[in-house]
Amino acid sequence: MDKNTVVGFLLMALVLIGFSYYSSQQTSQQNVTTAPTNKNQPAHDIQATPTIQDVDTTDLFANHLKGRPNVITLQNNKVKVYVSTKGGVISKVELKEYKNQQKTNVVLFSEKTASIDFTLRGKDKLLHTQDYYFTPTQISDTSVTMQISDSKGKTAFRMKYSLKPDNYMVDFCISSNGIYPYLNPSTKTLGIQWKDRVAQQEKGFMFENQYSTLTYMEDGNETRKMSETETSEENAEKPVRWVAFKNQYFSAILIGYDMFTDAHFKSTQEAEGSGFLKDYTATMEIPFDPSGKKDITLQFYFGPNQYRLLQSMDKYSSDGSELGLENLVYLGWPIFKWINRYFTIYVFDWLSQLGLPMGIVLLLITILLHIIVYVPRKRSYISSAKMRVLKPKVDEIARKYPNQEDAMKRQQETMALYSMYGVSPMGGCLPMLVQMPIWIAMFNFVPNAIELRQQSFLWADDLSTYDDIISWSVNLPFIGNHISLFCLLFCATNLIYSLMTMRMQRETMSQEQAAQMKVMQWMMILMPVFFFFMFNKYSAGLNYYYFVSLLIGALCMWYLRKTTDDKKLLEKLEANYRANKNNPNRKVSGMAARLEALQKRQQEILEEQKRRNNK
C-alpha cells in the first residue's frame, strides 16, 4: 500500500490568569473611587473607622476590623487595576486594549468571583488580611500603599502596589515593622490563598476551556499544568516560582522571588452555560521575616497570552532573572515548539506588521509552508509515478505467483524489479515525513495565537472561535448548536483530497493489494465526516488553515499529475534497468538493501519452518 496517504491521513487525525489630613487636601488629585458612598465624602472618611460594638479589642489590628470598602484605581495605557481597602488587595483588573463579547473591557480579575488572602500566625489565632480595612497612603496614578497598624501606630503591616508604565506588570511589596512580638515564635512564612472563578471570555466554551489551565513553574524552570478537561488537585513537588490562572488568551500570574513553598493547587471544572470555565485555588507559603528587616518581593502580571510579550517580561522581573512566562503559550512537543518558536512566530510577526488581514496572513504562511515542502512532495509523487508506470510488470509477477504460499517469492521478485529499475518503494513515504512536524506545529500554533482574536475575515467575524453560518438554540449531541462553514469547506476539501489520493493508490496497486485496501479506502472517505463532528466547534482560523492547506495540496497534486509524462518516465526507468543489468558488480544500498536483507531473512525462516513441518 502507498505509505504517503497513510502518513498524511494519520497526520490530519493528529492535526487531530485612613487618609491623613494631607491626603484629604489632595483628594481632587487622586484617582479614588468610593462605592457605594457619596462622591463628596471627605477623604479622611476613607480610613476605616472602628466602632466599639462587635470589635475584637484583643486583635492586634482591632481598629481596622470595621470600616467601609473603598477602591483606589491605578492605571496606565494598557490596564486598570482596582485596589480595595477591604483586605488591602487587588479587587478588579480591566484590560483597556481588549474587549469581551459585550464590547466592554476584558475583566481579568473581579472581587465578585476572586479573592486574595494573606495569613499571619498570631500567638493565639491566625490573622487574615481579608478581615481588615486598610488605610491607603502614598497614592498616585500608578501606585498605592495599603497599611494596617495598631492603635499606637508602632506596629504596621503594609502592601505596596506599583503599576509599571506601558506594561501589564504590577510590582507588589509586603513589609512590616514592630510585628514580631505579636506573632507565633515559629512564624517564618506568610500564608497565601488565591482563588479565582475564571469567566468565559470567548464565544465557544469547549474550545476556550480546552486551552484554559492552572499552570505553575517549579524551581528548575520546569513548567507544569493541571488538567484542561477534568477537575484535579495536586501538590507541587518543588518550590514554585510563579502560578498562573490562565484562560485561552489571558492570564493572571503571581510571581514570587523567594519561591512559594508548600504549594497546593486545585482546578474545578465549570459547567457549560454557567459563564465560567474553571474555579482555580492556589494555597501557598512564602518566606517572611517577622523582624521586618526584609520585605517580600512579588509581582503580578495581568494581560494577554502573547508569546513575544510574555517573553519580554524577563526584563521587568524584580531580580533581573528569566521568568519563562512564554511557556504559558503552548507550542507543542519539543520539535514542534522549536519550529513554532524559530520559524512560525517570526514569519507570523513579520507578516502581521505589514497590516494585512489575519486571514491573508494565514494564507501567506500556508503558501510559504507548501513552497518549503514542495521538493519532498514532488519526490514523493515521482516515486509513486514510477511505481505506477511499472505496474504492468508488477502484475506479471503477480500472475506468475498466484498462490498464497508463494507470497514471499512474489514480494522478493517485486522488490528485485524495483531495485533493477532504480525505484524505492519507501521513496513516497520518507519525504512526506518531513512535512509532519510543520503541520502539527501549525495545529498547536493557530489556536494559541491571540492575534487572531476578534479578527474578522470573509464571513467569519472572529477567527479565534467558530464561524457559525447556521445556528439554533438547542445543543445537539456531537454537533452543538451551529454549523461552521470553514469546517464544512475543510471537510469537503479533505474528501476531494482523499479521493485523489485513492485514485493514485489504485494506479500503483495490484488487484490483490486493491482488495486489501478497500476497508482503508472507506475509512478515508468517512474520515471527513468524523472531522466535521470533531472540528465544528474549533476556531474558524484553524479550520480555515486546514481548508487552505488541503486545497493547495490538492492543486499541487493535480499540477504534478498533469506535468508528469509517464512515457518519458518509463524510458528513464528502462535506461536504469539496462545500466543495472550490464553492471554485475552493482550493489544495493540504503533502504532497498535493508528491505532485501529483511525479505531474505523472512524467506529463510519460512523455509526452516517448512522443513520442520515435513519431518
Model feature map: region roles:
Residues D45-T51, D56-L60, P136-D141, M259-K266, ...:
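Generic detector of short, locally flexible boundary/turn motifs and exposed helical patches
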Residues M1-Q41, V83, F172-S175, S186, ...:
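Helix-loop-helix
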Residues V71-G324:
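Soluble non-transmembrane domains of integral membrane proteins
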Residues Y21-K103, M146, D150-K152, V588-K615:
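Juxtamembrane extramembrane loops of integral membrane proteins
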